[in-house]
Curated annotation (Swiss-Prot):
SMART domains: ZnF_C2H2 (SM00355). Disulfide bonds: none annotated. This is Escargot/snail protein homolog. The keyword Iron-sulfur does not apply.
Length: 81
């Protein structure tokens, strides 16, 4: 963290990471890798083929197929996905 700020203070060029799919630029490789998932959509539903960038989004989508509703209201007991 400190190296990043010290390099900037000394006038050195900051390293940047560009997305090959769009024009977005990031200051860390990790941030770029997370962004690239929005283009590659690596989490694919085996039932319908719909693709998602994050596993938890796929998990929520799977519930549309299974009908699972793991969350319920404490007051009325109505269930939600």
């Amino acid at each position: 963290h400190q190296q990043f700020h010290c390099a900037a203070a000394e006038g050195q060029a900051k390293k940047s990471f560009s997305c090959k799919y769009c024009e977005k630029v990031y200051v860390s490789l990790g941030a770029l890798k997370m962004h690239i998932r929005t283009h590659t959509l690596p989490c694919k539903c085996h039932l319908c083929g719909k693709a998602f960038s994050r596993p938890w989004l796929l998990q929520g989508h799977i519930r549309t197929h299974t009908g699972e509703k793991p969350f319920s209201c404490q007051h009325c007991n109505r269930a939600f996905a």
